[in-house]
């Protein structure tokens, strides 16, 4: 399977949850200045598609829906013919029809179907049943939306196959897919290896249908599940390039805390597409002109 690459736009460093394992996409700090506009994101989408054929963008954070420019940025990105995935905890979705009008895919964090465990993981008192209601509402408004329920597997909290099964079944009911993610943590006691997550799915009767360097895909009758490797985890650090994080100050990163970074703010603000391209192609070798 040919690897695909994209920009992962960290639109805001802020989040209303406090998940204890959060790696902050792009290794971004809450003090990071918000220097990019919706128009800037439209330029980035256009450049990525024109130069390298990157026709998808993932918007993440922080919690992307905290950002006041989220919807306008989505509109301008979509106008460039680029498909949008939003990664969200779904607690701020007041109107799914308006918020996700420009999305092709929504990935919702749902690490458990147990409200007590959910509160422990997220550090939030936001009710789990409201998140579940939001997932159902998204599906009702967008019957063709790709819907992933992201489940970070944590030892001693939600690594039991029966707990995984509950999210798999709910995902199936809303015509979505459960996506299990290995934990990025220096505390090895709570890390469940990718191979163990795969073993759990096989025990639940799934069969592996395909895989690449970062993901494996499984099926069981009409149900589907995915395991994806977290690019921030030490055990996956030698797997090469995947995606390019763009922080709201114009800094790009491949996500590693020790990663050399470079800033594209000037090139973005000046709409200098050639300068933009040269910096990215130097920094991110998989970026090949089409």
Question: Which residue ranges define each predicted feature?
Answer:
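Canonical Radical SAM [4Fe-4S] cluster-binding loop centered on the CxxxCxxC motif
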Residues: 1-39, 52
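Hydrophobic faces of well-ordered beta-strands that scaffold small-molecule active sites
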Residues: 5-9, 57-59, 84-86, 106-108, ...
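Disulfide-bonded cysteines in secreted/extracellular proteins and peptides
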Residues: 15, 19-22, 230, 238, ...
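Short loop/turn motifs at secondary-structure junctions
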Residues: 18, 53, 80, 102, ...
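Canonical radical SAM enzyme core domain
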Residues: 29-43, 64-105, 109-130, 151-166, ...
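Short Fe-S-cluster ligation motifs
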Residues: 43-61
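Radical SAM enzyme [4Fe-4S]-AdoMet core and its adjacent flexible, acidic
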Residues: 116, 120-121, 126-132, 136, ...
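Flexible mid-to-C-terminal extensions adjoining Fe-S/redox cofactors in radical SAM and related proteins
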Residues: 233-290
């Amino acid at each position: 399977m040919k690897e695909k690459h994209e920009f992962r736009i960290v639109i805001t460093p802020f989040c209303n949850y406090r998940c204890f394992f959060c790696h902050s996409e792009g290794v971004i700090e809450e003090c990071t200045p918000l220097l990019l506009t919706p128009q800037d994101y439209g330029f980035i989408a256009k450049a990525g598609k024109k130069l390298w054929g990157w026709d998808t963008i993932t918007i993440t954070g922080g919690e992307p829906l905290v950002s006041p420019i989220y919807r306008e940025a989505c509109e301008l990105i979509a106008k460039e013919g680029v498909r949008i995935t939003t990664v969200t905890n779904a607690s701020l979705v007041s109107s799914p029809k308006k918020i996700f009008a420009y999305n092709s895919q929504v990935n919702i964090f749902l690490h458990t179907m147990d409200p007590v465990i959910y509160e422990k993981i997220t550090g939030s008192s936001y009710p789990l049943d409201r998140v579940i209601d939001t997932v159902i509402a998204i599906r009702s408004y967008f019957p063709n939306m790709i819907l992933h329920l992201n489940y970070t597997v944590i030892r001693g909290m939600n690594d039991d196959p029966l707990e995984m099964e509950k999210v798999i079944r709910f995902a199936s009911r809303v015509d979505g897919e459960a996506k299990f993610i290995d934990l990025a943590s220096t505390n090895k006691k709570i890390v469940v290896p990718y191979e163990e997550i795969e073993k759990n799915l096989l025990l639940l009767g799934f069969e592996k249908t395909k895989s690449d360097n970062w993901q494996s895909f499984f099926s069981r009758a009409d149900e589907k599940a995915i395991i994806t490797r977290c690019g921030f985890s030490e055990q996956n650090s030698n797997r090469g390039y995947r995606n390019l994080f763009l922080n709201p100050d114009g800094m790009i990163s491949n996500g590693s805390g020790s990663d050399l970074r470079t800033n594209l703010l000037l090139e973005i603000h000046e709409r200098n597409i050639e300068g933009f391209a040269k910096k990215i192609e130097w920094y991110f070798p998989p970026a090949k002109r089409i």
